[in-house]
Amino acid sequence: MGLTTANTTLVAPQPKGILDPRTGKPVGSDDAFFNDLNSELSDKGFIVTSADALITWARTGSLMWMTFGLACCAVEMMHISMPRYDAERFGIAPRASPRQSDVMIVAGTLTNKMAPALRKVYDQMPEPRYVISMGSCANGGGYYHYSYSVVRGCDRVVPVDIYVPGCPPTAEALLYGILMLQKKIRRTGTIER
């Protein structure tokens, strides 16, 4: 019954994914983490890991970011939540409270008057906490670098983990920065000893 008359089982074709134009292979096929994971699953049928590695894996897949939009870069920051980029498919979602956030995205010109508020919000975030500096103004003052009222980079107020360049940076650049933060967390771990 149905569309075929033969009694054969229909099998879906191998998914192709996004191909890397340089290598011709699917993107991520040479990632050491996933290659190790696949080889362990095919050998044993289950995965043996440490608690540190499990917690680090869980943290990278559930980053909650807090918006600290100070200027025009905040518009591009909003774009990554829209359907075209859909940042939630990578396990990141916006939160309104610093007490529920892992990542703060500083987007825009940081003034001297706003710097204490930035530090206060950063101090309210639970450990481990991460900061992404988005745009030329947040990275180093940008166009307003020589103004008396502008902090020449938010790294003078809070420690920054990832810098996203551009004026304003595109939503793709911010998404790439978030993916690099996930890679950094995976590489360095999150548990202090």
Curated annotation (Swiss-Prot):
Positions annotated to bind [4Fe-4S] cluster: C72, C73, C137, C167
Domain of life assignment: Bacteria
Molecular function GO terms recorded: 4 iron, 4 sulfur cluster binding; iron ion binding; NADH dehydrogenase (ubiquinone) activity; NADH:ubiquinone reductase (non-electrogenic) activity; quinone binding
Any GO BP: aerobic respiration
Locations listed in the record: Cell inner membrane
Cofactor(s) this protein cannot do without: [4Fe-4S] cluster
Enzyme type, top EC level: translocase
Cofactor: how and how many bound: Binds 1 [4Fe-4S] cluster.
UniProt keyword terms in alphabetical order: 4Fe-4S, Cell inner membrane, Cell membrane, Iron, Iron-sulfur, Membrane, Metal-binding, NAD, Quinone, Translocase, Transport, Ubiquinone
Function field: NDH-1 shuttles electrons from NADH, via FMN and iron-sulfur (Fe-S) centers, to quinones in the respiratory chain. Couples the redox reaction to proton translocation (for every two electrons transferred, four hydrogen ions are translocated across the cytoplasmic membrane), and thus conserves the redox energy in a proton gradient.
Family recorded in the similarity comment: Belongs to the complex I 20 kDa subunit family.
UniProt protein name: NADH-quinone oxidoreductase subunit B
Gene source species: Brucella anthropi (strain ATCC 49188 / DSM 6882 / CCUG 24695 / JCM 21032 / LMG 3331 / NBRC 15819 / NCTC 12168 / Alc 37)
Encoding gene, per UniProt annotation: nuoB
